[in-house]
Amino acid sequence: MAEIVWSNPALDQLEEIADYIALDKPQSAAELVKKIFSTVERLGQFPNSGHALPEIPDSIYREVCVRPCRIFYRQENDVVLIIHVMREEMQLRKFLLDVDLIS
């Protein structure tokens, strides 16, 4: 089973999204965060269950979607590294994944 590791930027991005949703719907924000963590935890057993990125099909990155979010990750040996979280309606820029986001 792979270990799940969240980068600090990914956690910050998730927190920003949840804080924004919580302004109007605190319960919905809490449920979203819970569902995202649950979905990401399953990657520990099934790291290849995410999808290739349509914007960068030949990259090492994959994604899982929990509406309204996209969660980007890559697998390194026995580690699934969560590197970026964004809302679905935002456009992914290739340069975001070219930067080492681990801090």
What is the predicted role of each segment?
Residues 66-69, 74-103:
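Enriched for short, Lys/Arg-rich terminal
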Residues 2-60, 101-103:
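Basic, Lys/Arg-enriched alpha-helical interface segments
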Residues 62-64:
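Short acidic-hydrophobic surface loop/beta-edge motif
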